Amino acid sequence: MNSFPWLTIFVGLPISAGFLIFVFPHRGNKVIRWYTIFICVLELLLMTYAFSYYFQLDDPLIQLTESYKWINFFDFYWRLGIDGLSLGPILLTGFITTLATLAARPITRDSRLFHFLMLAMYSGQIGLFSSQNLLLFFIMWELELIPVYLLLAMWGGKQRLYSATKFILYTAGSSVFLLMGALGIAFYASNEPTFNFETSANQSYPVTLEILFYIGFLIAFAVKSPIIPLHTWLPDTHGEAHYSTCMLLAGILLKMGAYGLVRINMELLSHAHSIFSSWLIIVGAIQIIYAASTSSGQKNLKKRIAYSSVSHMGFTIIGICSISDMGLNGAILQIISHGFIGAALFFLSGTSYDRIRLVYLDEMGGMATLMPKIFMMFSILSLASLALPGMSGFFAELVVFFGIITAKKYFLMPKILITFVTAVGTILTPIYLLSMLRQMFYGYKLFNARNSYFFDSGPRELFVSIAILLPVISIGIYPDFVFSLSVDKVEAILSNYFYS
């Protein structure tokens, strides 16, 4: 048990500081923005300090644990803790949220509410990744919905209410299955419910019941990841959301679903995961091909990047369901890698829209000459997205490939077939990304526009872009930085699988 409540502070600080925003004057947009950035940076620095000094990389057990009695009526504890699986997503959350807050500079309408919602999301995300209690996990999962819905409905495009409603219907509807699964596990074979992850991991269930639990959790996580065919909310949401919200959606929110698949479906329900993993690998391979092909046909820039996110999450699904050391480590690396790259692409698409007020690719052309800095950053990060060697995406996808090839669960021919289909997906990725760059940056369409003079990237845009690019290159050169966080935890998870 940790003597100092680091994790409780990390969960409570952003939302508590967010409430103070409403004390600020209505017209203090600049003060509110810098106050929010200060809180985000302070949180990130505190997390970096605490994890550097108190987290042991070679210990696969839960660390920095905190457990406080919350509700006596049914023995509910505020139970937090982190391990190698949650450490990476927590640091990613702090990094991306800080940059998304800095990216939200153009927001002036209802600035106090906007920045409060950003901080509320921050707390919910940290709480979810550090939760060691099923009911607390569900509460943090739900805490995300209201801020995201309001951010979509109030700061977005013309169809923002439609996309926000679609988002809430999908995510809130699927959350019912998450709650049912959590309650089922808690009340099984006991008059006194226990939501503790550790207790649930050591519990055995009848096969049929475990499959039902697995399906319930899978539906909830498949919507958030997303996994086809439960992905249709994502392109509409990204297409209408402000780009700072898109950064949080692509960088963190989608990763919550993949994290839940590992933390609950794979770790708590290992027998059911063994049964479903073969089918989910097929779904993951189809998802890579389908989303990449669909992305090529999108005329809306943000929707093209959104389908790119769906395609890349297919690699995460394959890695998780390979039930191999390399595959699961590759999936975790892909979660971190795509968190950076996806957030960067949506940020750059938003800054481009701020300048040219165009979102359809067939209306663009010639941005390379008018805005060379944006062209340079967009090109580099697009190459990172298509897994260029030396970038983080390359090692993530490569390790997932090795993971499925070396998986002991599957026969040789299915592994070769899945690898071949997945490889086709990697060929489709440069097709839609390079086509996107050609339509945006080459040609002469913008030269003929009435206001043909456009401002290039400023210091703020360059800082955010470079800040995201640096970890993408660093992980691409030295991926052991991420692997060192997760390798011991992955071995502990796979010890439940006899063919691992």
Curated annotation (Swiss-Prot):
TM ranges: 4-24, 35-55, 84-104, 113-133, 134-154, 167-187, 211-231, 242-262, 272-292, 305-325, 330-350, 386-406, 416-436, 463-483
Keywords in alphabetical order: Chloroplast, Membrane, NAD, NADP, Plastid, Plastoquinone, Quinone, Thylakoid, Translocase, Transmembrane, Transmembrane helix
GO cellular component: chloroplast thylakoid membrane
Coiled coil: none
Protein location: Plastid, Chloroplast thylakoid membrane
Record's catalysed reaction(s): a plastoquinone + NADH + (n+1) H(+)(in) = a plastoquinol + NAD(+) + n H(+)(out); a plastoquinone + NADPH + (n+1) H(+)(in) = a plastoquinol + NADP(+) + n H(+)(out)
Alphabetized GO MF terms: NADH dehydrogenase (ubiquinone) activity; ubiquinone binding
Membrane topology, record value: Multi-pass membrane protein
EC number: 7.1.1.-
rRNA-binding as UniProt keyword: no
Any GO BP: aerobic respiration
Enzyme type, top EC level: translocase
Cysteines engaged in disulfide bonds, as pairs: none
Membership in a protein family: Belongs to the complex I subunit 4 family.
HAMAP family for this protein: NDH1_NuoM (MF_00491)
Name of the protein described by the UniProt record: NAD(P)H-quinone oxidoreductase chain 4, chloroplastic
